[in-house]
A protein has these predicted regions:
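Residues that form or immediately flank small-molecule/cofactor binding pockets and catalytic motifs
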Residues: 13, 55, 85
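Short aromatic/basic micro-patch
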Residues: 8-9, 59
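N-terminal first-folded block
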Residues: 9-42
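Generic detector of low-complexity/intrinsically disordered segments
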Residues: 23, 52, 56, 78-81
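Short, mixed-charge, low-aromatic patches
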Residues: 4-5, 23-26, 47-50
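Enriched for short, Lys/Arg-rich terminal
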Residues: 1, 5, 16, 27, ...
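A short, surface-exposed loop/turn module that caps and links secondary-structure elements
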Residues: 34-59
Length: 101
């Protein structure tokens, strides 16, 4: 039986977040995503489910940076929504909303 592996895609805003970062940090985050998320069979293993108005989303911790993603099990996709420093990710948590696709 063939094992199912997840694919990773970035939203436009996540791509912009990555471009805003220092090149060495962006490289580190891309490497982490490549090694830990691309091709994984269980994306929830390394992440943590978010709660409140971010319920349904997952976060991955890479040093002081956070990757916020939506896991779409039906199509085996990890959609990265935001990449930012921990302080920025949770600063306006009550006001922050993500459009579910």
């Amino acid at each position: 039986m063939e094992k199912k592996c997840y694919e990773v895609k970035f939203t436009e805003s996540a791509e912009k977040d990555l471009k805003k970062l220092n090149k060495s940090i962006a490289k580190l985050l891309k490497k982490w995503i490549s090694e830990n998320l691309i091709g994984t069979q269980n994306p929830k293993q390394r992440g943590k489910a978010l709660t409140g108005n971010l319920k349904g989303l997952w976060r991955y911790r890479v040093g002081s940076y956070r990757i916020v993603a939506e896991i779409k099990n039906d199509i085996l996709l990890i959609l990265i929504i935001e990449i930012s420093d921990r302080k920025e990710t949770y600063k306006d948590k009550k006001r922050k909303t993500y459009k579910k696709k």
